[in-house]
Regions:
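Bilobed "Venus flytrap"/periplasmic-binding protein-like clamshell domains
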Residues: 1-36, 51-55
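Second-shell loop/turn segments in exported
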Residues: 3, 40-44, 84-85, 97
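Soluble non-cytosolic domains of exported or imported proteins
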Residues: 3-8, 29-33, 48, 85-93, ...
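Ligand-binding clefts/hinges and TM-proximal coupling segments of bilobed small-molecule sensing domains
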Residues: 8-17, 99-152
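A ligand-binding cleft/hinge motif common to bilobed small-molecule-binding domains
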Residues: 12-17, 40-41, 45-76, 115
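Short, solvent-exposed alpha-helical surface patches in well-structured domains
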Residues: 56, 93-94, 110-111
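Periplasmic-binding protein-like
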Residues: 59-96, 118-143
Length: 152
């Protein structure tokens, strides 16, 4: 299996390999393109990476129908965040309110659909990744928790 060097994905794969005694040969690739090429050219049987990144590589490949992304999660979701000044609660309150309004008001769904379920310029690629239940749940009730378990 291949994954991109320096990512949390290769770290998680390595940890699971050891903890579960899977005996997987893990190949670190220098970047996502090299990792995908290794699967494309049969030098690796699978590529472990974030589903959206995999979807974009598949959509841009020569034969998108030759690939599938597993539905089973390899790990807990990793929350993304917005970095802001630590000691500015007034600004954090404004950011929290603005993002909550975006998520709960339906605009986030429109933005998501634009980039993940429709053709994207300039090449017209469609990632065909409908919003998952965990993200829908998070949009309905936004949180700033860094705990992956809070996103189930």
């Amino acid at each position: 299996m291949v994954s991109t060097a320096g990512t949390t994905n290769i770290k998680q794969l390595t940890e699971a390999n050891g903890a579960r005694s899977l005996n997987i040969n893990i190949i670190p690739a220098k970047d996502h393109a090299e990792a995908f090429l290794m699967v494309e050219t049969d030098r690796a049987v699978a590529f472990v990476m974030d589903d959206i990144l995999l979807a974009s590589l598949i959509a841009g490949s020569k034969a998108p129908d030759d690939y599938v992304i597993s539905k089973d999660a390899f790990s807990k979701p990793e929350p993304y965040g917005i970095m802001l000044r630590k000691d500015d609660p007034a600004f954090k309150k404004v950011v929290d309110a603005a993002t909550a309004a975006l998520y709960t008001g339906g605009e986030a769904q429109k933005i998501y659909d634009k980039w993940f379920t429709q053709k994207i310029p300039p090449k017209g690629l469609n990632l065909n990744v409908p919003m998952g239940s965990e993200l829908k749940s998070e949009f309905a009730k936004p949180s700033d928790s860094p705990d992956p378990d809070s996103y189930k």
